[in-house]
């Protein structure tokens, strides 16, 4: 039995339909579905095909193939022949220089405008149009046009990189509108503020006029790392720093007004993103920033020498002050992150519907980076209950860690000179010998340096030596001889206000242990 398949009968369905050759009376014909014209006589280098009627006759002498006739006379300046002394190359370069590229712009498939979208269309139209315009210039149009085209392609490469970074990374789909908000509400961190006094520049913490971003009723928004010094009624005073970028006349000024601004802006950004016109809104917002004029409400000067935080300059306050000077950006980010929990409560309690809409919409579309930006924006102006940024957290940590403080590691010795006790002629602060934590003193008593303690306590006055009186409570004015911090009745002298013009150098000295010299609080 054969295994070959059974032959099928050819029908109209299984028959391969091949085009038939058709000849036309005019001489043309269709061969294999292609229309061919009749050849009119032999060409140079090609032998003529014999006619059908001539095939039965004997072939005559083969005709030679005609060749092109060599021209007579000069050989240069002819098609295919060079000019003498490299004239052909020179004239070619001359023609390339004299013919502007703009008369025949052809970007081809690599045209940057083919891959543009949103704001990129505007940028690529400007760069490519500039390249075409440069090509119209005679003599230098060709090289300038080529360089401009290369520049346009380079800009397009940068745009592709930005589009990839902001569109393909999870949760990092930024819009121009939020970038515009960041440029308005959080000014870039500056390095140091300086003031010019008779041609001499001094480093100061007072904000310059260029550091002021926005002024409202009783509040000033500024760059981080400085504090506004406002002149009112012929006197200059430092304003209270509510946040690293927001200062108020006093700590009781509510920040509701500036927070409503943020609420409105975030709500507008959310609406633009939901309507897929975020880039258009951002472009309009950025352009409006260039033409918006905000009148000055206050006169900011630089003769206060403000501290970055008001009040007594403690060690932790001093450390935060130095951090603000060293890295204003890091201090700004840390302070805003620490305020996010309180900002969440204020958003809900204050009914900030624009911020709530943004926090509800952006997680649904997976833009978690925008959620963080909105929280940082609101935390940057959430200073209603904030008096010192980072100072509260630092003071709380200091109170807890002070229980375990072992005191100074240096073995000190107290010396009694004319009734006053001093520390062995070192630069250590006298109070450091008594800064041993309570728990550390209980469990590490053998390591606690208690030299001179009995003598110290013996010089303290008993309670019956104090004055008895009645009436309102007032501040005592102890004499210099009564300044004994080791006694239980020690009362420090009240802090006074020192004008900045009378302070030469820093307000505190850095010895082996920081010693606070004074502060220039001017309220």
Swiss-Prot record:
Location of the region described as Important for lipid droplets localization in the Swiss-Prot/TrEMBL record: 164-167
A Gene Ontology biological process term: fusion of virus membrane with host endosome membrane
Positions in the Lumenal compartment: 190-358, 380-523
A Gene Ontology molecular function term of the record: RNA binding
Side of membrane Cytoplasmic, spans: 2-168
Keyword match Cell membrane: no
Span of the signal peptide: none
Source domain of life: Viruses
GO cellular component, one term: host cell lipid droplet
Modified residues (N-acetylserine): 2
Keywords: Acetylation, Apoptosis, Capsid protein, Clathrin-mediated endocytosis of virus by host, Fusion of virus membrane with host endosomal membrane, Fusion of virus membrane with host membrane, Glycoprotein, Host cytoplasm, Host endoplasmic reticulum, Host lipid droplet, Host membrane, Host mitochondrion, Host nucleus, Host-virus interaction, Inhibition of host innate immune response by virus, Interferon antiviral system evasion, Membrane, Oncogene, Phosphoprotein, Ribonucleoprotein, RNA-binding, Transmembrane, Transmembrane helix, Ubl conjugation, Viral attachment to host cell, Viral envelope protein, Viral immunoevasion, Viral nucleoprotein, Viral penetration into host cytoplasm, Virion, Virus endocytosis by host, Virus entry into host cell
Motif (Nuclear localization signal): 5-13, 38-43, 58-64, 66-71
Region (Interaction with EIF2AK2/PKR): 2-58
Site (described: Cleavage): 177-178, 191-192, 383-384
Region (Interaction with STAT1): 2-23
Record region (HVR1): 385-411
Phosphoserine PTM positions: 53, 99, 116
Residues carrying covalently attached carbohydrate according to the record: 196, 209, 234, 250, 305, 418, 424, 431, 449
Region entry Interaction with APOA2, spans: 122-173
InterPro entries assigned: HCV_Core_C, HCV_core_chain_A, HCV_core_N, HCV_Env, HCV_NS1
Ranges for region CD81-binding 1: 480-493
Disordered: annotated span: 2-75
Region called Important for endoplasmic reticulum and mitochondrial localization, residue ranges: 112-152
Pfam family, one: HCV_env
Homology family: Belongs to the hepacivirus polyprotein family.
Protein name: Genome polyprotein
